[in-house]
Amino acid sequence: MPRNLVLFDLEWNIGYQPYTFNYHGVQQTFRGEIVEIGAVKIDEDANVLDTFSIHLRPRIFRKLQHHIAKVTGLTQADLDRGEPIVQGLRRFMQWCGPDAEFAEWGLDDVPVLKQNLFLCNLDESRPTVWYDLQQVFLREHPRKEGEGMTLESVVTRMGVPMERPFHDALSDTLYTADVCRLLDLRAGLAAYPTEDEALRQSLCQTPGDYRDFTVFHGYVEQYAWRADPKISQMPCPECGTTLQPDEIWLKKGSNSWYTLCQCPSCTGSSNAAGQGVFQRYKLSRRDGLHWSFARCAQMPDAESLARWEKLRTAQLERMRAKAEKQAAEK
């Protein structure tokens, strides 16, 4: 059975003030309200089979933000005469079909789509499968220094004829299809990592003795990885005893955390956990609504232990200085 591949692009409006909404008890910030959808159905050689284009009339951000108008060329009249957003989104998802695999240039649009579906009381569980076509492109054409990854820059670099405007949803989607026809799209999609594989690659980047990699999916609370014992409590990779984490957690990058744990049974022994075990986490909110938490243990060596002690000492000093400053301001 042929795959139902949908390339899509969204244009969305934003407000002059942030808008938050309640998602299953958790406040989330609205990324933007969709005002235009462009989509094409393609086969695995990126031949266009069907197209979809629609302007939507927003309900929340009704006034067109000036920056959005400048980038997209949309006018307030375009928004005002658009199809009501609930009706338009329902029609788009019906056109896609329940088995659709979505693809976009980047990973910005699916979270926006899912938030909009939820706020319109539509099923936000779809899509369940989607691809970042930038990653498929980079598999064949590794990025060189100074090269941009915007759709326009890649279209220029690949010599695709520029016969349509950019920042028009359907036009951008057709350009994406043009680029895909210059790739081995079948191989790129076949090699595309699952979310778990991508999290493993991110969490276990450097060489080391990593163990017990696990991913926990579907959480709406960002800090559930610290609060839920199922996620926060980890067994010792050597003996199975629950590890005891240090009071200090260090942040690495935007969404990675780690600490040095001790095993009550192994500490001081000659086995791999005798000097402690690093407990590592990588957080991801790929769909814009739910958090996934990747966790693993890393057995330390002399170099990583020395680096931990140095960074831990620096963190304690920052905490001490902050506490003294707050006390002085009272």
Model-derived segments and spans:
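Metal-dependent phosphoesterase core characteristic of DEDDh/y 3'-5' exonuclease domains
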Residues: 31-37, 41-72, 93-219, 283-287
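Acidic two-metal-ion nuclease catalytic site recognized across multiple nuclease folds
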Residues: 182-330
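Short loop/turn and capping residues at structural boundaries
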Residues: 18, 80, 128, 165-166, ...
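A general structural-boundary detector
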Residues: 26, 75, 79, 100, ...
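Conserved non-catalytic scaffold segment of RNase H-like nuclease domains
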Residues: 2-111, 272-314
